[in-house]
Structure formats: C-alpha cells, structure tokens
Amino acid sequence: MIHQSSLELVGGTPLLQLNNWMRLHGLKANVIPKIEALNPAGSVKDRAARQMILEAEKAGLIGPGAVIIEPTSGNTGIGLASIAAARGYRAIFTMPETMSVERRMLLKAYGAEVVLTPGAAGMKGAIEKAEEFENPANPLAHYLTTGPEIWADTDGHVDMFVAGVGTSGTVTGNGRYLKEKNPAVKVVAVEPDASPVLSGGKAGPHAIQGIGANFVPGNYDASVVDEVFRVPNDAAIAAARALPKAEGILIGISGGAALHAATELAKRPENEGKNIVVIFPDNGERYLSTVLYAE
C-alpha cells in the first residue's frame, strides 16, 4: 500500500511483551507496552494532534491560511507541527523554557515558531484557551484508535491499562473504551510523586517531562480511573535508563514512570498471570540533553 499523507501513518503501533524485563524483575504478570514512538512524528501525541486538527477543520474553525496557536510541553507541539505542515497551516507554540532542547529543535524543524514561558510557572504559564487540556478531540483520538488497537491486538485479553497523565487524553480515552468493552479492566493513572494533584496532593516541580501538569486537566475523567500511582523522579529515571539495556528499547522519562508503575503493579500477587498494557509515549532520543542521560 502507498499512503497519500503522513496523517494516514498515525496509529497502528505495536505491542511488545517485555520478556527480558519480566525475567530480570521476577514478574509473574505480563508487562506489555504499546510503542508510541513509532508514530510518524515520534510520539503518542500524534494521535491527539491529528484528531484535534481534523475536528477543527470539520467544525469550520480552521481552513486555508489559518494559524494554529497552542501551549505544549513538547510532544503535542511536535505532533501538531507535523500535522500542520502536512495540512498547510502556520503553527506557533508556547512552552515552558524547562522543556528539552531537542523538543524545541524538532518544533522548528517542522517549520513551527516557538515562544518560551518561565519554567517556574510550569504548564500553567503556557496555557491559553481552547487548548489540548480541555479539547474533547484529545481523549476522542484514543477512544477511536488506541483503545480499539489494544483490544484487537490482545484479543480482548487486557486486564490492566497503565498510562502517565499529562493532558489526560490517553488515560481518559483508553479508559472509556476499554471499560465499555470490559468493565473489569483496571485503569491506572500515573503521576509524579512530587506533584500528586490527581490524588489530592499539592502541585510542585518535578523531573518527569510530559506528565504532571500541576493541575487537574479538564479532560481527566476520574470515573474511569481505578488507581492513581505516584512515581518518584528517581524511579522514573532509573526505569528509563535500565530498559534499553534489558530490551533494546529507548524510552523517555514519562515512559520510565509508566514502566516503574507497571512493574510494581506486576509484583502484586493478585495480578499474577494478568496482562498489563502500558503506554510508552515516546523515544529516549528526545531527552539526550536532560537529566535522563546526565553523567
């Protein structure tokens, strides 16, 4: 098949059972990540980006000559910049200055403009109205694509779904779909221990880029979340550093957080023999200048 647009390449990412990792940690549950780095612009955010732009076009909100202005913690902007380029739109993104240099460079590589906001303000400092944290097209993308892919690829044998929460589109959309298919599926939201707002704690600075926006997103649907799992900075970094040596797969810091959570969940006796599907949002190459690879 010859595809006619890069938009057609979004989704359809594979599941991979981490057999080496499971042996290394003595796990009796199956840890099965979905490798979202294989999307065309390199992350899970390609899904929401495509859906948001297509929904905006359908609603007549954007058309030829339009300018897309969005706040982003990085991957969303990269996905939007890619889709915007393919659809012929100009794109401008606001993002905290603390985000990795690689992310800024990638945005510019797609022809987007970048406006940096003070890092101390976190994502709140980059928020404008009508953004991804509130946009219903964000969870819809996962309800329509990621969830059905997981269900089909596991033949419906998914017992637990684990995902980090940034905008919350991934956990909300997948949670809704999977629980419609089987209400017994457990959905686990992962957040930074240093900024545990989903579990009622106080917002604070943390090192896990891509999750933990320091506020509860409008798209977050607590009714589909069975557990909120808090991950310390060092645990996320340690998992992200260890996985490539065990499995030959590079992941980012938020993927490390999700992997740490999934690993701890797999150690629980009640989860023996269960399939734990976890989202790996992107590739570790996006974080070469960060604490993840600091000497």
Indicate residue ranges for each PLM-predicted region.
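PLP-dependent amino-acid enzyme catalytic core
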Residues: 1-295
